[in-house]
């Protein structure tokens, strides 16, 4: 993976700071979990591995949902919204990001929050809807349970929902019955790229 990243960077002739996203928990550039990638990444400093491949170029590695949340809060659906903004990405699992007045609370992993005896993503990921053949109405009830569990813990000011299914937000967001406003992501597939660039140039957690 590091060699592929280096090849892309070199192709564009980029020598400035680089932001890289990863589908799991990352602390100080070190990979802590590996749900959808090889377990050998756990405990490895992805930041150092990639930087070494790039001859010492500055590299920042962060969770992919965190990157998307940063971008949506600053430039997308959460633009000009103060307080606590929570991004949830619905796909194979559920990714999450929490932004408070522009600052990231990293690695929240709400997809693994227990809701009614099940992990949130086992209850309400869009893959569950597809696998079980649920209607949007039935699936929205499960999403509502996840949102309410998060609301009970932290009282957010806005939920932003992303992932491929957010493109059909008009079919299910109006069916949600939680108290906090819910809006679809605006930047879609570019959110992670924009957020990675933000993290590469600024300390987004302080």
Describe the residue ranges of each PLM region.
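Internal amphipathic helical hairpin motif
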Residues: 45-49
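ATP-binding/phosphotransfer module of carbohydrate and carboxylate kinases, centering on a glycine-rich
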Residues: 1-18, 26-30, 50-59, 71-90, ...
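Gly/Ser/Thr-enriched, mixed-charge loops and adjacent short helices
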Residues: 67-69
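A charged helix-plus-loop insertion that forms the helical arch/lid used to bind
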Residues: 31-44
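Short loop/edge segments at beta-strand edges and connector loops
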Residues: 61-65
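Conserved NAD(P)H cofactor-binding loop of Rossmann-fold oxidoreductase domains
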Residues: 23
């Amino acid at each position: 993976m590091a060699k592929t990243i280096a090849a892309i960077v070199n192709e564009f002739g980029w020598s400035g700071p680089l932001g890289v996203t990863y589908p799991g928990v990352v602390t100080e550039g070190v990979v802590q979990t590996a749900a959808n990638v090889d377990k050998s990444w756990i405990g490895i400093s992805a930041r150092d591995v990639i930087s070494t491949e790039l001859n010492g170029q500055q590299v920042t590695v962060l969770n992919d949902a965190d990157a998307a949340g940063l971008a949506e809060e600053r430039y997308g659906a959460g633009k000009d919204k103060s307080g606590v903004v929570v991004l949830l990405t619905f796909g194979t699992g559920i990714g999450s990001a929490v932004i408070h007045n522009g600052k990231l609370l990293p690695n929240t992993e709400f997809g693994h929050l227990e809701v009614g005896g099940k992990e949130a993503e086992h209850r309400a990921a869009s893959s569950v809807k597809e696998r079980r053949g649920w209607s949007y109405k039935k699936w929205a009830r499960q999403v509502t349970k996840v949102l309410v569990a998060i609301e009970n813990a932290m009282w957010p000011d806005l939920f932003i929902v992303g992932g491929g299914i957010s493109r059909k937000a008009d079919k299910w967001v109006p069916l949600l019955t939680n108290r906090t406003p819910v809006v679809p992501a605006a930047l879609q597939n570019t959110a992670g790229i924009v957020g990675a660039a933000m993290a590469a140039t600024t300390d987004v957690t302080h």
